[in-house]
Design a protein with these regions (language model features):
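A short, flexible low-complexity segment enriched in Lys/Arg and Gly/Pro that occurs
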Residues: 1, 74-81, 122-132, 230-251
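ATP/NTP phosphate-donor binding region
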Residues: 1-95
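Short, acidic Gly/Pro/Ser/Thr-rich loop/turn segments
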Residues: 24, 47-48, 149-152, 189-191, ...
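Predominant activation on well-ordered alpha-helical scaffold segments within soluble catalytic domains
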Residues: 27, 56, 67, 82-85, ...
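Glycine/threonine-rich beta-strand-loop-alpha-helix active-site module
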Residues: 79-184
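Carboxylate- and glycine-rich phosphate/diphosphate-binding segment that chelates Mg2+/Mn2+
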Residues: 158-251
Length: 251
């Protein structure tokens, strides 16, 4: 059984910094990536949670200024992204820290996508046959910090948003926009309601099953998927019903 209480760094497919308390290194991570004034993007429901204030305090201790943008609904809209871009530009920010569950990270990734270029948001629609011809320097440097289990969306650029004119959900992305790194701090998952732990854990389990079941066989991905299935199926029930045990282990 892996020891999940130790710190570990690896790259797959982007740099990942894992371990209890790694959030306390966020200011250092910003400095290492030449981010001096990040916009912290999260959703309204997370705005007043302790970890948001902690991110700002840790950044300040590393002489990194930051501002929180939290005008994000559970299903982020194109209008909210436009307001987020305006906050990014007016605040003269040089990076984005996307923190939260799906909505916070989707919004942060979308603001990173359009924050320092003039391309229309929907030009990045995943269903378009061609993406805008932009270099990686055309996108805002991005750090992702997930606060729940789930899809692994912190490692890639896709963001699901609501098109308010057509009242449909659309996916935006660009192949050259990827997070600089993801910070996986399991302490952020402690204290979640049991039902949310169950939902997001099942989400992660289903993604692992899907990854193993796809017809395009890949031995590396199959190995990762099978290990994820083994770990989640052996831990999820205990995490939901005895979450305090995990909290004691991480104390």
């Amino acid at each position: 059984m892996p020891n999940f209480l130790t710190h570990a760094d690896w790259t797959f497919p982007i740099p990942i910094r894992y371990g209890p308390g790694r959030l306390l290194e966020i200011g250092e991570f910003c400095s290492q990536n030449n981010i001096a004034n990040p916009l912290i993007v999260t959703d309204r429901g997370s705005r007043d949670l302790p970890f948001i204030e902690r991110v700002g305090d840790v950044c300040l201790a590393s002489k990194v200024q930051s501002v929180v943008f939290s005008d994000i609904s559970p299903n982020p809209t194109d209008q909210e992204i436009a307001r987020g871009k305006r906050a990014f530009v007016e605040g003269q920010h040089d990076g984005v820290i996307a923190i939260g569950g799906g909505s916070g990270m989707d919004a942060g990734k979308a603001i990173s996508l359009v924050g320092c270029n003039d391309t229309d948001l929907w030009a990045f629609d995943y269903d378009h046959s061609e993406s805008p011809d932009l270099a990686s320097e055309s996108f805002v440097p991005l750090i992702c910090v997930p606060t729940t289990a789930g899809t692994g969306a912190e490692t890639e650029s896709t963001a699901m948003l609501t098109d308010t004119e057509q009242s449909v959900k659309r996916c935006v992305w660009h192949a050259k926009q990827k997070p600089l790194l993801a910070v996986l701090d399991p302490e952020l998952t402690l204290g979640l309601p049991a039902d949310l732990t169950a939902w997001t854990g099942c989400d992660a389990l289903v993604h692992a099953i899907e990854a193993f079941s796809v017809p395009d066989w890949n031995p590396l991905c199959d190995g990762l998927a099978l290990e994820a299935i083994r770990l989640i199926s052996g831990s999820l029930d205990r995490a939901v019903t005895h979450g305090e045990i995990f909290q004691l282990l991480l104390a």
